[in-house]
Each structure stands twice: as structure tokens, then as C-alpha cells.
A protein has these predicted regions:
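Extended, highly charged
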Residues: 1-280, 284-295, 299-568
Length: 568
């Protein structure tokens, strides 16, 4: 990690804070502010972390915002991430060579594969410069949000292996410190680590070995969140990107971790013990609720004498995970295209927090082609977690040019082109009535369809008209120049939103899309309105299609809507 910090410094991407800063909220708050600066943001190195409540000073500095912008991401990759995506695309399209030059190029490609698999070192070869810590309390573990249940490791590389040791997995899971030598393992039900857990448990075993690494090459933690197919070790991707194998050293529990890790925590998950984990302010921008999760017993902690503790803060976008997700989006496009050949491009808007909204451009060749691809998306790996997807044709503007793209989509909007489905969803999703399972919606905006022309009113007149039927606070129309403006409505909910929508259908000649939100939202901030809407809706419950009009209930839910979980 020290080597990468030097690289950040040389590229003017590092800000060093010498003053003592508290691990309880303060470090995370400063990192949050810095991350909001976008491409102007820098990584932050806190040289003197402290805990005021415990009257404690830590010896290990804290690095935040490692992936502060696209330049930092490329520095971690050692090259442009777009170059990696192009290389994957060419690899997938390899064909039998005919000319001598093509044969040589093919041979050189094959030779480069020898550096992909990790290299295992002899036992403890790299541990000579490590010291043994007595407990987790010696690490500057952060509390990032006021209502978090405690301190969490937020950039831990969690290494596991299956029962017969034929598969290895690297995942990035938050880890709540529940005692001085105990962590709570937030394994989501769909993740490989959780699958290994059930292998051990079904075999009647009591323990499952787990090791956690922190720091080292920053590409390790990026690889940990890469959506690779089940059974593929994430560090193979490291070898492909860097063209050099990861060097792994064994822990005493049999798990291998990178030799240059700054901190290594090894132990085991007790297969019979669970404790309440959370709440935690997560990347969705909401607190995830307290739930039972497995307990990891820490047996040994190693740390370099000059170790750097790497951490991150997640919450309302945009934050550091935006940059990490950008690399993922670009690099996995060629792989996704193998399952969806007519996919031209896709984009995960940051305010859609990855799994809540995806935009896709396709080469639409026949009726219902977009619907066919919707089903493909919802059945491919981690794409299956996506709640909402909008598809446009190959002539659409760039998927990142929202000012041009959104009117283009609205000119092609038709309620008959909306597909409502259901399936698995991210365990962090709070809107669905059931954990891990809920509604999905796809919109086919590939073809311009003739629809009746609306009589568009000014916002004030439309609000006055609507108030004759429903008690509203305010409204704002977006993209009034398009065929289907979006009308966002603020209200203090007095009845089910569907009832309010039904009443407003009397004025349907003035609108095609109504979105209902709670009073605390700001109509001037369209970025956060999108974030709120895609977070707060379950498509099967909250989307109403009547008389060729669309209603969306993005308000908080409760018993009236059949929602029995705790709304965050």
C-alpha cells in the first residue's frame, strides 16, 4: 500500500492529514466531503487516527478514497481500464489464425496467460516483517455513520475456500467488530462465501476457516467486488490486468492471502453461532436493518510494522464506489455481450446505486427484442439483481449524455412497452416486501410510437387543477418539451397512492407519467429524485398502469401497502 500511496502523491492525488482525527465519524465525514468533489477529489491519508471516547491513539495511518477518481483507478490498474476492456473483447473474439503474423499474435496471447494464475509461496515466506497484534482494538477501525451499530471494517478482502479446497473466493463484505477478537460476517445469501458456508455446515462441521486481508495492492480490493461467474477466483482477474501473478502466502488456517497485505486477520466462522449485525449506512444511501449473521472468531492478527489501514465510506451517491463500479461496468461489457450478442453498450447511473437502474443500448432487430434481452439481463450473474432497466436502440444518444438521452426515451415511452416481472433482488434492497425477492420493471424505448398529444400546462396551473381532487404540496414537470413529461408530485400521504393516482386520471390529457414522493424531497434536485425513486419502489406493488398512463409510488411504505418490514 505504501508504494501506491507514493504513486498517488507523485500524481497530486493525495492529501495528507497530520492532525489527530477521530475514527468515530470524523474520518468518514471528511472522506465523504472529499469524495463529493468528483474528479477534483483526492485520496486522504490520516497519519494520526485517534479514538476520543477510548482516549486512544493508533499507530497505523488510515487511507480513505483510494479510488478518488478515474485517474487513480487507472493507476491502480497500471493502465487504462478501457484498454483492459478492449483486451477482453479481442480475447473473446479470437479466431483461428491464417497468416504468419496472426499466428505469432495468437501465440503471444497464449503466452500472456501464464501470468494469470496466482503463485503460492512457501509457508510464511513473506511474514518476516509482520508483527502480531493482540486484538482488533489495535486497528483504527471506523464508525462511519451516526446510527451504525458500531465499528466496521469496510475494505476487508475476505478469503475463503470450499470444503474440498478446489475453489477459492475473494469477496468484499462489511465486517462489524462485535468484540475485541470477534467480527460479524455480512455474507449476503447469494454470494460465494455464503455458499461455501453452507457446504461446511451441511457436512456437519463446526468451523469454517476465513482470512481477511487489508491493504496491499489496491487492485486486490477492486477484484474482490468484480462480478465474476461462480467458481472463478477473483485474483485471476488481477493476473489478467497486471500481467503478473498475485503472490500468495498461507495463513495458519490454510487460507492463502496476498503476500504484501498490510494487515491479515485469520480465524474461523463458527457455524453454529449468529449475532445481530447492523444497522449500517450502506451504499444504497439507507441504513440496512439489523439481522442475524455468522460470527467470525479471530485467532491471529498480523500487521506490517509500517502498515496502512485502508477503509471507505459508503452512502448517498456519488462516492468512491462510483469509481470502482465504473471500472466494473466497462470491463465486464464484453463478457456480458457473450450472453447478449445484440447489446451495444450499457450504463449503470451512479444514482441508481448499481442494481437499481441500468440503461442499455441494443441493436433491436425484431418485435419484443428488448423484452427478450430484459429476461437475459435478469438471468445473468449479478445482473439478475437489477430492479429496473431501460432499453434504447442503436441510434440513441450516448448513454452518458442524460440531457439528450432522457428526452429521446420519453419520446418513445408507451405503457404497452413496460414489462413487469419479479425475481431475486439485492439483500440490501429495502423496498421489496420480502427480503431478497421482489418486482422488476423493464422499458422498451427502442421505437418511436404514435401517441396522442398532451395538453401541457404550466406547473402552477397543473398543481391547482390536481388540488381539486388530491391534497398535494407541490409538483414539477421534467422534460416538458418531450412527448411524455415526467410529473413529480410531493404530498403528505393521506391515502394509498394508487387511490390518488386514480383520482388524477380525470386530468389524463395533461400528463402521461406521474411520480409520487414524500414531502421531504427536493424537486429542484433531479439527481436525488432518481436515487429516491429507484430505491423506494417495488415494481409489482408500486407501478400502476391505467388508461395508458403510468403512476409510480416512490413514497415510504407501511402496513397500508402490506409492507411489514422496518422501513429505513
Amino acid at each position: 500500500m505504501k508504494e501506491f500511496i507514493q504513486i498517488l502523491k507523485e500524481n497530486d492525488l493525495l492529501r495528507v492529514i497530520e492532525e489527530p482525527v477521530d475514527v468515530d465519524l470524523e474520518i468518514a465525514h471528511l472522506a465523504y466531503i472529499e469524495a463529493k468533489k468528483g474528479e477534483k477529489g483526492k485520496a486522504l491519508l490520516f497519519k494520526n487516527p485517534i479514538d476520543k471516547k477510548l482516549n486512544k491513539q493508533y499507530k497505523f495511518p488510515v487511507l480513505m478514497n483510494t479510488f478518488c477518481n478515474e485517474k487513480a483507478l487507472n493507476l491502480a490498474f497500471g493502465r487504462d481500464y478501457e484498454e483492459v476492456a478492449e483486451e477482453i473483447s479481442k480475447l473473446i473474439k479470437l479466431h483461428i489464425p491464417t497468416s504468419f503474423k496472426a499466428k505469432m499474435d495468437f501465440f503471444m496471447n497464449l503466452l500472456s496467460f501464464k501470468n494469470i494464475p496466482p503463485k503460492r509461496l512457501k509457508k510464511n515466506k513473506a511474514l518476516y516483517d509482520y508483527e502480531i497484534l493482540n486484538s482488533l482494538e489495535e486497528l483504527p477501525i471506523l464508525k462511519t455513520w451516526e446510527d451504525d451499530a458500531g465499528k466496521f471494517i469496510t475494505m476487508g478482502q475476505v478469503y475463503t475456500q470450499n470444503l474440498d479446497k478446489t475453489q477459492n473466493n475473494l469477496g468484499m463484505y462489511r465486517l462489524q467488530m462485535s468484540d475485541k477478537n470477534e467480527l460479524l460476517m455480512h455474507w449476503q445469501i447469494h454470494k460465494d462465501g455464503a455458499n461455501f458456508y453452507h457446504e461446511y455446515k451441511n457436512a456437519g462441521l463446526k468451523k469454517m476457516p476465513v482470512s481477511i486481508a487489508i491493504g496491499g495492492d489496491p487492485l486486490y480490493i477492486w477484484c474482490s467486488q468484480a462480478p465474476l461467474p461462480k467458481g472463478i477466483f477473483e485474483l485471476l482477474l488481477y493476473g489478467f490486468i497486471k500481467k503478473t501473478p498475485v503472490k500468495l502466502t498461507p495463513c495458519e488456517n490454510g487460507i492463502f492471502v496476498p503476500y504484501d497485505s498490510d494487515v491479515v486477520i485469520e480465524g474461523y466462522v463458527d457455524l453454529e453461532e449468529f449475532k445481530i449485525e447492523g444497522p449500517f449506512g450502506d451504499h444504497t444511501g439507507f441504513y440496512t436493518p439489523a439481522e442475524l449473521f455468522p460470527v467470525m472468531k479471530v485467532e491471529k492478527i498480523y500487521a506490517k510494522k509500517d502498515a496502512i489501514y485502508q477503509a471507505t465510506v459508503v452512502g448517498k451517491p456519488p462516492l468512491e464506489d462510483k469509481i470502482m463500479g465504473l471500472g466494473t461496468e466497462r470491463i465486464f461489457l464484453p463478457l456480458l455481450q457473450t450472453s447478449v450478442p445484440d447489446l451495444i453498450d450499457y450504463n449503470m447511473p451512479e444514482n441508481g446505486v448499481f442494481h437499481n437502474l441500468i440503461l442499455a443500448k441494443i441493436d433491436a432487430k425484431y418485435p419484443a427484442h428488448a423484452q427478450q434481452i430484459m429476461h437475459a439481463f435478469w438471468g445473468v450473474g449479478q445482473m439478475s439483481f437489477v430492479k429496473h432497466a431501460i432499453f434504447v436502440d442503436k441510434n440513441a444518444p450516448s448513454l452518458k449524455d442524460y440531457d439528450a438521452l432522457i428526452p429521446y426515451m420519453l419520446d418513445r415511452f408507451n405503457t404497452k412497452k413496460i414489462l413487469i416481472s419479479e425475481g431475486i433482488c439485492d439483500q440490501l434492497d429495502h423496498a421489496s416486501p420480502n427480503s431478497c425477492f421482489g418486482g422488476k420493471a423493464g422499458l422498451d424505448a427502442c421505437e418511436e410510437i404514435q401517441v396522442e398529444e398532451l395538453e401541457i400546462l404550466e406547473d402552477e396551473k397543473l398543481l391547482e387543477l390536481f388540488k381539486t381532487k388530491v391534497e398535494l404540496l407541490n409538483l414539477k414537470q421534467f422534460y416538458k418539451e418531450s412527448k411524455s413529461p415526467i410529473v413529480c408530485i410531493l404530498l403528505d400521504k393521506k391515502e394509498k397512492i394508487e387511490q390518488s393516482f386514480d383520482k388524477l386520471l380525470e386530468f389524463k390529457k395533461h400528463f402521461r407519467i406521474l411520480v409520487f414522493l414524500d414531502a421531504e424531497n427536493k424537486l429542484e434536485n433531479s439527481y436525488m429524485l432518481v436515487w429516491r425513486v429507484v430505491n423506494n419502489i417495488d415494481a409489482k406493488r408500486d407501478i400502476f398502469i391505467k388508461e395508458e398512463r403510468l403512476g409510480v409510488d416512490a413514497s415510504a411504505k407501511g402496513e397500508a401497502e402490506g409492507y411489514l418490514r422496518a422501513w429505513p
